[in-house]
């Protein structure tokens, strides 16, 4: 450990400078780390990091931050904290959490607290809306096996679905209203097209979700069926009679 007259501190284990601390920052020499550590994905399960936090053994349902920051607007307040940490649930792998919220009071007191979850299987949960320039869903035919064309009846399925306006609440447990929306109900869609509905766990409760891609496919099929019906309606009456006669007689 080296301390300069200006108060700067340098950590140099075995004579190699690893970190430098002064009154405004902490600087870590990451190049020392990369020179002696593997950079492949397959090894990361056993590799630590230049800054490494080991929480050790923890309880079955808990969350501990790894790093946290906080700021407040001068003369206005709105003390906000952001942290990255690990959440543990019973009998399962951990979740990476990014939490953004008030540092003035708890969520129980009505203060904001958004928790973004990153699960081990690649699933991501957001408590709010997503705003993107576009969203692309993998739909390559090479990824789809056992294909079977959807049978007729899509138009009837669509007609049986009811469209509602409703207040969307945050969760099964938290009934505070997010905003007014319009849409369909997952339970209704599940009766007509079960492939379009999935079940996920949100805040300890099972919640049904809808695949917009599947709903779009159902609408496309319904439009195709409607198009055939319109063509039939536009067909002249005598042409229809001729078609029926041609089934029984050949000229």
UniProtKB/Swiss-Prot annotation:
Q: Which InterPro entries match?
A: S74_ICA (IPR030392)
Q: Which residues form the Peptidase S74 domain?
A: 139-237
Q: Determine if Protein biosynthesis is one of this entry's keywords.
A: no
Please list where the region (Interaction with the receptor-recognizing protein gp38) is annotated: 134-137
Query: Where is this chain's protein located in or outside the cell?
Result: Virion
Q: Which PROSITE patterns match?
A: ICA
Query: Major place of localization?
Result: virion
Which GO BP terms, alphabetically?
symbiont entry into host cell; virion attachment to host cell
Cellular component (GO) terms are: virus tail, fiber
Q: Does the keyword Transport apply?
A: no
Pfam families reported in the protein's UniProt record: Peptidase_S74
UniProt entry keywords in alphabetical sequence: Host-virus interaction, Viral attachment to host cell, Viral tail fiber protein, Viral tail protein, Virion, Virus entry into host cell
UniProt site positions, description: Cleavage: 139-140
Describe the PTM: Proteolytic cleavage and release of the chaperone in the host cytosol stabilizes the folded protein.
Record's superkingdom? Viruses
Subunit structure as annotated in this protein's UniProt entry: Homotrimer. Interacts with the receptor-recognizing protein Gp38.
Say which family it is in.
Belongs to the S16-like long tail fiber protein Gp37 family.
What's the protein here called? Long tail fiber protein Gp37
Q: Which organism is it from?
A: Enterobacteria phage Ox2
This protein's encoding gene: 37
């Amino acid at each position: 450990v080296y301390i300069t007259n200006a108060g700067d501190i340098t950590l140099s284990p075995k004579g190699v400078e690893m970190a430098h601390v002064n009154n405004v920052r902490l600087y870590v020499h990451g190049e020392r780390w990369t020179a002696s550590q593997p950079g492949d994905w397959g090894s990361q399960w056993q590799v630590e990091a230049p800054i490494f936090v080991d929480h050790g053994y923890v309880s079955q349902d808990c969350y501990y931050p790894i790093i946290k920051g906080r700021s407040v607007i001068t003369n206005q307040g709105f003390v906000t904290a952001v942290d990255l940490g690990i959440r543990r649930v019973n009998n399962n792998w951990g979740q990476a959490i990014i939490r953004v919220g008030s540092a003035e009071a708890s969520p129980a007191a009505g203060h904001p607290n958004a928790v973004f979850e990153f699960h081990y299987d690649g699933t991501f949960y957001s408590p709010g809306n997503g705003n993107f320039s576009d969203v692309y869903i993998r739909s390559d035919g090479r990824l789809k096996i056992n294909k079977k064309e959807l049978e007729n009846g899509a138009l009837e399925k669509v007609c049986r679905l009811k469209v509602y306006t409703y207040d969307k609440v945050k969760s099964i447990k938290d009934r505070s209203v997010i905003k007014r929306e319009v849409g369909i109900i997952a339970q209704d869609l599940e009766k007509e097209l079960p492939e379009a509905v999935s079940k996920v766990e949100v805040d300890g409760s099972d919640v049904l979700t809808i695949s917009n891609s599947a709903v779009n496919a159902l609408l496309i099929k319904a439009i195709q069926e409607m198009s055939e019906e319109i063509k039939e309606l536009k067909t002249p009456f005598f042409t229809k009679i001729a078609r029926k006669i041609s089934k029984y007689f050949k000229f």
